[in-house]
Regions:
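Sec-dependent signal peptide recognition
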Residues: 1-10
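C-terminal lobe and pocket-closing loops
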Residues: 207-275, 304-307
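An extracytoplasmic/periplasmic, membrane-proximal ligand-sensing/linker region
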Residues: 23-25, 212, 237, 260-320
Length: 320
């Protein structure tokens, strides 16, 4: 009986703690500059989540630098009380941990709260290119080894990884096509438009308007067809189901050792956000696909992403 009473008291205490949190504003660290995908996604979360957080404000703070590592470390070292949280991205928790051997944190040193959204990727060519499908692109690369090129935003970026992984899945080597590195995702799209390169893979929001205008031709999209460009096949439909692993994403994480009641409160908040029209509309407007998951599912997803990019970094020989 004493054991049962103790267990009930513990449950009651946890429930009370969950209801009592938060009792003050929450700082939401965005580890990238204002105006980018991470910033917009974080602010959409903040403005819509606070109504389910005892009306306590979520205050976005941009701590950019070192490809997201500075802001990420800030949260890694924060007090585990639930009042400093992180907008985690594919760069901070998959690519950087795989790429940087001396990175000061590991991807799994955080409390996972929820995956938030997926950000589709599109592989594409110029609108007037003779290549009309992924299979035709593979044939063109194979027939002209070392002569075709693709645009990336840098060696360790998801744009580079996406094109390299596509060639790997097609049975090509990294030398079959040449990567040309630009300064950002916007320049990647522009490079294809200007015929500086033959193809690229990039975040959907910068590509969709050009596809709709006919100036770019999308070969496939990950992870599924998009309503904005419904005639563009998914990667699986184009014959490359493995490319569905190449997708941008956002998650909410906290420092290691967050109390269980804080994790449970956020699980409840995300269940409400999943039905919240304001969050849904903001997410769709920013080109995201809602992907709310449990903490355990989020950890499994992030682990799979890290393992994928760890393999790619090793294959490309670019680990630093």
């Amino acid at each position: 009986m004493k054991t049962l009473v103790s267990a009930l008291l513990a449950l009651a205490s946890a429930a009370a703690g969950a209801q009592g949190y938060p009792a003050k504003p929450i700082t939401l660290i965005i580890p990238f500059a204002a105006g980018g995908d991470s910033d917009l996604s974080g602010r959409n979360l903040a403005v819509n989540a606070q109504k389910y957080l005892n009306n306590q404000p979520m205050v976005p703070v941009n701590r950019a630098g070192a490809s997201g590592a500075i802001g990420t470390m800030w949260v890694r070292n924060a007090a585990p009380d639930g009042y400093t949280l992180l907008v985690a991205r594919i760069a901070t928790h998959a690519i950087l941990p795989a790429l940087e051997s001396k990175l000061q944190y590991k991807w799994n040193e955080f409390t996972m709260l929820s995956l938030i959204e997926l950000n589709p990727y599109i592989c594409f060519v110029r609108g007037d290119a003779p290549i009309r499908s992924a299979a035709e692109l593979v044939n063109a690369i194979r027939a002209n080894p070392g002569k075709l090129n693709f645009a990336t935003a840098g060696i360790g970026t998801s744009q580079n990884m996406a094109s390299q992984y596509f060639m790997t899945l097609a049975g090509l080597t990294k030398d079959h096509a040449v990567g040309i590195h630009f300064k950002g995702g916007g320049e990647v799209t522009t490079a294809v438009l200007a015929a500086q390169v033959n193809f690229a893979c990039n975040n959907a929001p910068t590509v969709i308007p050009q596809v709709r205008a006919g100036t770019l031709r999308a070969l496939f999209v990950t992870p599924a067809r998009l309503p904005e460009i419904p005639d563009v096949p998914s990667a699986a439909e184009a014959g490359f189901p493995g490319m569905n692993a190449i997708v941008g994403w956002t998650a909410l994480m906290g420092p290691p050792g967050l109390p269980r009641e804080v994790v449970e409160r956020w699980t409840a908040v995300f269940q409400q956000l999943a039905r919240d029209p304001g969050w849904q509309q903001g997410n769709a407007r920013l080109g995201g696909i809602a992907a709310i998951r449990s903490p355990a599912e989020t950890e499994r997803f992030v682990r799979e992403q890290f393992e994928l990019y760890n393999r790619l970094v090793g294959m490309l020989g670019i680990r630093q």
